[in-house]
């Protein structure tokens, strides 16, 4: 299979499947053959990213992700996507291990957020983004690393609210339990109170909440990073977005 999209997945498995579903739903196709070819590594046993970043585990996930990226390149993929924000702590190593492009979910999300702000019903310049993500993503500062060159300040929830986000990700979504609208809106409102111009679902598990609670229909200032990556993937594949 040539010119396929390589999906470096399994981080986590549910987000990977949801990401593929998003791409299919977003692509303007009237028959099977008009959809995007994808080769997927749903490598669920990759060591925990957050545990390694926080120093709670000595088992690095980097080698496994580099190996998967190289496997996708060898299989003929034209570019690679990684539907996991936390894994982008290792982005440069993964990118440098292959000769094909690797889309960066964080860069794509920040760029989209800036453009989306100017297209709102009441246009707003995006200067501050609230990041809802794993402890690993927050502590590693990956959003701030990519946000600073774009002129965007990226801020995390206060510690008590970060614990609530951690609970949603690990004890509810990954464990197969639903998250209530009240719970996620409490955190979103907290970020609005910190002066954020937009709130980023910066963990692909949180994308499940975004979908299930239809936050995109009611919260113009909430942006799902997985949705942005899926959109960018469709466009980079040379396909049109479905209206």
Name every feature range the model reports, one short phrase each:
Residues 1-243:
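Non-catalytic structural scaffold of enzyme domains
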């Amino acid at each position: 299979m040539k010119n396929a999209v390589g999906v470096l997945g399994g981080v986590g498995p549910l987000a990977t499947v949801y990401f593929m579903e998003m791409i299919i739903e977003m692509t303007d196709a009237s028959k099977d053959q008009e959809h995007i070819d994808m080769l997927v590594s749903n490598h669920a046993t990759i060591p925990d990213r957050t545990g390694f970043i926080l120093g709670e585990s000595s088992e690095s996930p980097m080698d496994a992700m580099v190996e998967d990226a190289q496997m996708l390149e060898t299989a003929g993929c034209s570019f690679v996507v990684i539907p996991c924000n936390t894994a982008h702590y290792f982005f440069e190593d993964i990118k440098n291990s292959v000769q094909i492009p690797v889309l960066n979910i964080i860069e794509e999300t920040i760029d989209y957020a800036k453009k989306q702000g100017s297209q709102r019903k009441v246009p707003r310049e995006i200067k501050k983004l609230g990041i809802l993500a794993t402890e690993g993503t927050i502590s590693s500062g990956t959003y701030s690393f990519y946000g600073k060159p774009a002129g965007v300040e990226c801020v995390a929830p206060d510690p008590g609210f970060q614990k609530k986000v951690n609970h949603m990700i690990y004890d509810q979504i990954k464990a197969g339990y639903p998250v209530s609208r009240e719970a996620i809106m409490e955190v979103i409102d907290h970020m609005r109170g910190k002066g954020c111009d937009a709130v980023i679902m910066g963990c692909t598990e949180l994308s499940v909440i975004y979908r299930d609670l239809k936050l995109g229909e009611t919260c113009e200032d909430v942006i799902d990073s997985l949705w942005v990556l899926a959109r960018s993937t469709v466009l980079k594949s040379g396909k049109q977005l479905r209206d």
